[in-house]
Amino acid sequence: MEIALVPLENGGAMTVRGGDEARAGCGQATGGELQCPPTAGLSDGPKEPAPKGRGAQRDADSGVRPLPPLPDPGVRPLPPLPEELPRPRRPPPEDEEEEGDPGLGTVEDQALGTASLHHQRVHINISGLRFETQLGTLAQFPNTLLGDPAKRLRYFDPLRNEYFFDRNRPSFDGILYYYQSGGRLRRPVNVSLDVFADEIRFYQLGDEAMERFREDEGFIKEEEKPLPRNEFQRQVWLIFEYPESSGSARAIAIVSVLVILISIITFCLETLPEFRDERELLRHPPAPHQPPAPAPGANGSGVMAPPSGPTVAPLLPRTLADPFFIVETTCVIWFTFELLVRFFACPSKAGFSRNIMNIIDVVAIFPYFITLGTELAEQQPGGGGGGQNGQQAMSLAILRVIRLVRVFRIFKLSRHSKGLQILGKTLQASMRELGLLIFFLFIGVILFSSAVYFAEADNQGTHFSSIPDAFWWAVVTMTTVGYGDMRPITVGGKIVGSLCAIAGVLTIALPVPVIVSNFNYFYHRETDHEEPAVLKEEQGTQSQGPGLDRGVQRKVSGSRGSFCKAGGTLENADSARRGSCPLEKCNVKAKSNVDLRRSLYALCLDTSRETDL
């Protein structure tokens, strides 16, 4: 049964029971209303409502009963104790984890809070220029300086509620666009290459961003060549393959260049008439049936020539005693030794065999052994040493062609000559333009040789007997050489010749600027590699000896290991800014006429240097 105190309008109170009977404390109900006089001890003033219980009036007709009399006014009644509302059941710990952060409420509230946190604005001050972005934009790359809260915390200014960076202001447009675009890096037009590369490294955008930046700016990634794993083979390979690796490597390179030059000079000198006549006399002495005039003597039989057999034996020592043959043998011995040593020490035998320079080395020494075998075969009895059959003449013709291959030894100098390497790279990069040039010349030769042939056909003294015979004239005219051995005579032929010369000038002039541009690019890139090496030697930061740095020995770049040497330039540049080294030694630009791309290339190559925060 529930009991509740219900205040009345006249100041009384009644108790409502859940049953059918109710007694009024101050009166009884009349006409459905309860009438009670004022309770004793209460003023007619504002009445304070009695505290309510948990019950409610069930029925208007239910009975009431009077409350017990109130205590005296002098005694203060005790207020009724409020009943405790039932507390909600506290969820177990696993339920709390599922519900999320109690400060945010439900899981949905936590998601909304996280989303609002990502959309929170961040103020970045770059040398006084304020930028504003969102935390979610920076959080796309958490490994960068701005994306990692722990890394950027040291730059936070609590007074201004912003991050302050004393860096280049125009460069930050490209840095912020990197975050906004999701990884696209674009250099502002008013920022130099080296400055923007330094900003990329400061904000720690990573090696991948640096590689993309280098590719966008037109830098070609050099192929890294591994070194042999064996320590002895590594040292031998560095000595014979990379002349700048040590002093002994430079000495080997000097000896190799001298041997190549001696071989080329010998190849040219042995074709002089005086040396050629002497060699012919050594190889082919007078025949037995053509002796010199006999001198009178006591014994007439002394003028008889010996039989042909004994005359073959002296030819062998005479041929091997030829000075040119001795010099050639010495050079070939060195070339063979160098080739075998490099093949033994190379890290990859298959890659060594496919290298064009190694193929040239083999071709350079191959004719010697064929010539030596042929000479020895001719000296054998019954080998046709007299040279009186057609087979020997054919073999001599083949030997001349084979010995012509010796001229390719001059390309061995490209291993030690940067100029030849630049020329080779330029031709390799300009193959398309060279193909177009040859194609244009081919079309012009066909057109103008046909035109000049028909223009000169009616003239009896013409120099053009056929269209193929006019090819030579068209090539000489289009290349503006003009030997004059073949020339048009008639007016029509001269007009054709004039048009041919003009067309040749225009045809050659079109692709030449592209080839020159490629040459300039490779030339400046090679000089960029030389500058850090010179500066490194002046500073003396690293000794040039067999004990090379382990990091350099693991991977060597394709062009003199400049990738490994670029770090020295950056260290010297940092020292120059800090004032720890003389300015005349640290400032590369002040010592040589080097453009802006030199310092950038060194910065881009050294992607492993950590940025000081």
Curated annotation (Swiss-Prot):
The family database entries (InterPro entries) matched by this protein are listed as: BTB/POZ_dom, Ion_trans_dom, K_chnl_volt-dep_Kv, K_chnl_volt-dep_Kv1, K_chnl_volt-dep_Kv1.5, SKP1/BTB/POZ_sf, T1-type_BTB, VG_K_chnl
Q: Which residues lie on this side of the membrane: Cytoplasmic?
A: 1-247, 346-356, 417-431, 524-613
Swapping R184P leads to an effect described as: Found in a patient with pulmonary arterial hypertension; uncertain significance; significant reduction in channel activity; affects processing resulting in reduced abundance of the mature glycosylated protein
Q: Where would I look for the motif PDZ-binding in this sequence?
A: 611-613
Residues that the record marks as modified (Phosphoserine) are: S557
- Intramembrane residue numbers: 468-479, 480-487
Q: Name one GO biological process term.
A: protein homooligomerization
| sequence repeat intervals | 61-71, 72-82
Query: Residues bearing covalent lipid (S-palmitoyl cysteine)?
Result: C346
Q: Which regions are flagged for Basic and acidic residues bias?
A: 45-62, 84-93
Stretches in topological domain Extracellular: 270-323, 378-395, 454-467, 488-494
Question: Consequence of mutating K536R?
Answer: Abolishes sumoylation
Q: Name one GO cellular component term.
A: Golgi apparatus
Activity regulation summary: Inhibited by 4-aminopyridine, nicotine, bepridil, correolide, and endothelin-1.
From the Swiss-Prot or TrEMBL record, state where the protein is found.
Cell membrane
Transmembrane spans: 248-269, 324-345, 357-377, 396-416, 432-453, 495-523
Asked whether the UniProt record includes Heme among its keywords, one would answer no
User: Which segments carry the region annotation Disordered?
Assistant: 1-108, 282-304, 532-559
Region entry 2 X 11 AA tandem repeat of D-[SP]-G-V-R-P-L-P-P-L-P, spans: 61-82
Which family is it part of?
A: Belongs to the potassium channel family. A (Shaker) (TC 1.A.1.2) subfamily. Kv1.5/KCNA5 sub-subfamily.
Associated condition reads: Atrial fibrillation, familial, 7: A familial form of atrial fibrillation, a common sustained cardiac rhythm disturbance. Atrial fibrillation is characterized by disorganized atrial electrical activity and ineffective atrial contraction promoting blood stasis in the atria and reduces ventricular filling. It can result in palpitations, syncope, thromboembolic stroke, and congestive heart failure.
Q: What is known of its domains?
A: The amino terminus may be important in determining the rate of inactivation of the channel while the C-terminal PDZ-binding motif may play a role in modulation of channel activity and/or targeting of the channel to specific subcellular compartments. The transmembrane segment S4 functions as a voltage-sensor and is characterized by a series of positively charged amino acids at every third position. Channel opening and closing is effected by a conformation change that affects the position and orientation of the voltage-sensor paddle formed by S3 and S4 within the membrane. A transmembrane electric field that is positive inside would push the positively charged S4 segment outwards, thereby opening the pore, while a field that is negative inside would pull the S4 segment inwards and close the pore.
* Biological role: Voltage-gated potassium channel that mediates transmembrane potassium transport in excitable membranes. Forms tetrameric potassium-selective channels through which potassium ions pass in accordance with their electrochemical gradient. The channel alternates between opened and closed conformations in response to the voltage difference across the membrane.
Query: How does this protein assemble?
Result: Homotetramer and heterotetramer of potassium channel proteins. Interacts with DLG1, which enhances channel currents. Forms a ternary complex with DLG1 and CAV3. Interacts with KCNAB1. Interacts with UBE2I. Interacts with XIRP2; the interaction is required for normal action potential configuration in the heart.
The name this protein goes by in its record: Potassium voltage-gated channel subfamily A member 5
The organism of origin for this protein = Homo sapiens
